[in-house]
C-alpha cells in the first residue's frame, strides 16, 4: 500500500533559530561578567543574582499558572535573563527583600501585565530597576568598593562610582578628578558600581559572542556607543577641565551593559536596521544629557525606557518599502 502524503502548513524549512536558542546564548554571554563580579565584589554578587533569578522564575510561574491560567513559559529562559539583568543593575550589598520586590515589579508589571513575552513595551528588568531606584534611592546609590572574593555581603564598604565623580567634576569640583580610577581599571573591572558594570572587557566579550551567534546585530550597540563617544568627546574638547575623556563614559556605569544586553531586546527595540540606528542614537543622546544635567549620575536605564516608548513611532517611520512600491 502506497504511503500517504501528509501536507502541512508552511514553513517547511527551519533554520533552527528559536527563542530558547537565542536566550541560551544570551545567558552564556552574561556569564563572564558574573564571574568577574564575583572576584570583584565577592559572594554578594552571587547571592543577589541567585535571589533575583529565583524570584523572577517564581513570579512568572505563579502568575502564568494561577492568574493567567496558561502553560508554564519558564522554558523559554526569558524570566531567567530578566533575573540576571535585574541583578546586574543592582549593587552587590542590596537587601534581599528589595530584590524580591524588584523581581515582582519586573515580571508582574513590566512583563506579565501586558500579556507576557512578546507583548511588553518596556524592558522588564529596567522597569524593576527604576522602581527600586525611585523607591529606595539610598540603598540603590550605595556602591560597594572592590574588595575581592572575601568581601562581606552585609558589611561591604561603600564609595563613589566613576559616574559620581564625573558628575562632581562637571559641577565644578575639579579636585574629584584625582579620585577617578585609571582607564585600565575601568576596562578590566576593578571599580565600584552595579554587579554588571564591573568590566567593559567582559561585556565586550559578550557582545562578540552574541554577534558571532547572530543573536543580535551591530546596529544598536554601535550606534549607542558611537553617539555617547561623539557627544562626550565634543564636550571634552570644548572644556577638558569640566568634562572628562569620552573613554571614561564608555567604560563607566551601565552603558556597555545596556547597549549590548538591554537595548537589544527583540520585543522592545525597532524591527529594521535603520530604525535600530535611530533608536540607538536616541538612547546615546539621552544618556549623555541625563549623566551631565540630570539628578541621577547614570542615565542609561531612563534613556532605554524612554526610547522603548518611542519604538512604535520609529517602526512606523522606518517601515520598509513594499516590493515594487514607488519612492515617495
State where each predicted segment sits:
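N-terminal signal-anchor module of multipass membrane proteins
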Residues: 1-57
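Cytosolic-side transmembrane-helix boundaries in multi-pass membrane proteins
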Residues: 1-24, 292-328
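Alpha-helical transmembrane segments in multi-pass membrane proteins
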Residues: 25-33, 48-60, 78-83, 87, ...
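Structural signature of hydrophobic alpha-helical transmembrane segments
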Residues: 42-55, 93-102, 190-200, 243-255
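C-terminal ends of transmembrane helices
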Residues: 58-70, 107-118, 205-214, 260-269
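Membrane-interface helix-loop-helix junctions at boundaries between adjacent transmembrane segments
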Residues: 84-153
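Loop-to-transmembrane alpha-helix initiation sites
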Residues: 121, 125, 246-254, 276, ...
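Long hydrophobic alpha-helical segments that form multi-pass transmembrane helix bundles
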Residues: 124-204
